[in-house]
Amino acid sequence: MERGMHLGAAAAGEDDLFLHKSLSASTSKRLEAAFRSTPPGMDLSLAPPPRERPASSSSSPLGCFEPADPEGAGLLLPPPGGGGGGSAGSGGGGGGGVGVPGLLVGSAGVGGDPSLSSLPAGAALCLKYGESASRGSVAESSGGEQSPDDDSDGRCELVLRAGVADPRASPGAGGGGAKAAEGCSNAHLHGGASVPPGGLGGGGGGGSSSGSSGGGGGSGSGSGGSSSSSSSSSKKSKEQKALRLNINARERRRMHDLNDALDELRAVIPYAHSPSVRKLSKIATLLLAKNYILMQAQALEEMRRLVAYLNQGQAISAASLPSSAAAAAAAAALHPALGAYEQAAGYPFSAGLPPAASCPEKCALFNSVSSSLCKQCTEKP
């Protein structure tokens, strides 16, 4: 009796195992058919963030067979108008079915199969992976590489290829496809969990890792730009330094020439090179040179006036004494060189004047000239 019960229990266990294998095979075929083509009306990049489930359900190996959320927030169901696209994407399933990669839920059952209508919604989302889902998701979001599981059949690669080929996919999900393909089989979905915004499996994590790598590339290009700007600034600084050196050398030569000229001027000006006077400054040298030039000009002007007045007196005396003038003219005709010399010298007392003329008469003759020539007349009594 007990042996019969054991045999019956064993037969029932074998039937359950066979039923489980057949269900798994049919589900995997339909999931693979759904993975091969992404429905045109479904954009996974715009999906809302997943609801966080308790840690007990995410770490439990039986999370695949737990019932879905009572509120239905864990399932991403498109609007009713997308039923036709879902059935077309799932290979001609039920009319009211919804075809989503990794999510096959319809009015006629899971994946349009009425025989699978008894399974909960979480079983359709589970891909028969173990309790390493939470660890794989965390590792993938952090950018770490994970080794594929033994029971991985390459379906995740098909999903990633379809996601990359979709032109409506977000840039984060598309960029993270290559990174997420390495450890995609470890990022799994449990019952009632929704699809991440970046795509199925580790798409969101891949997007973040690719975004971080893209940020690194941007920083690298920024460093390259800063290096080029620093090189250009160094070239400009070198050019400015060379120009400044040339200007300084030119000004130094000019100052040397000016100092030499001032030294020559000090050597010519009186009292500027005496031992009792120290070397004059530039401004003092120029002022002294100006005063010296003005003094010389005044002395020359006084000499011209004196010579003019003496010549005028000589002409008056010659007119008063015609005999003497005639004698002077005859003498000039006989000796023209002597007459020219006398006129050039401007001697005030010519030969035409009487030799017996006294000093007061001479001073009276040149009374308009204030000169030192008549001092002897005024000093004498």
Curated annotation (Swiss-Prot):
Keywords from the UniProt entry: Neurogenesis, Nucleus, Repressor, Transcription, Transcription regulation
Known partners and oligomeric status: Interacts with PRDM8.
Cysteines engaged in disulfide bonds, as pairs: none
GO molecular function: DNA-binding transcription factor activity, RNA polymerase II-specific; E-box binding; protein dimerization activity; sequence-specific double-stranded DNA binding
Chain residue ranges for the region called Disordered: 30-94, 135-154, 188-242
One Pfam family it belongs to: HLH
Cellular localisation: Nucleus
UniProt protein name: Class E basic helix-loop-helix protein 22
Gene Ontology biological-process entries: axon development; positive regulation of transcription by RNA polymerase II; sensory organ development
GO CC terms of this entry: chromatin; nucleus
Biased segments, Gly residues type: 82-94, 198-225
Role noted for this protein: Inhibits DNA binding of TCF3/E47 homodimers and TCF3 (E47)/NEUROD1 heterodimers and acts as a strong repressor of Neurod1 and Myod-responsive genes, probably by heterodimerization with class a basic helix-loop-helix factors. Despite the presence of an intact basic domain, does not bind to DNA. In the brain, may function as an area-specific transcription factor that regulates the postmitotic acquisition of area identities and elucidate the genetic hierarchy between progenitors and postmitotic neurons driving neocortical arealization.
Tissue: Brain-specific, with the highest expression in the cerebellum.
Organism domain of life: Eukaryota
bHLH domain sequence ranges: 242-296
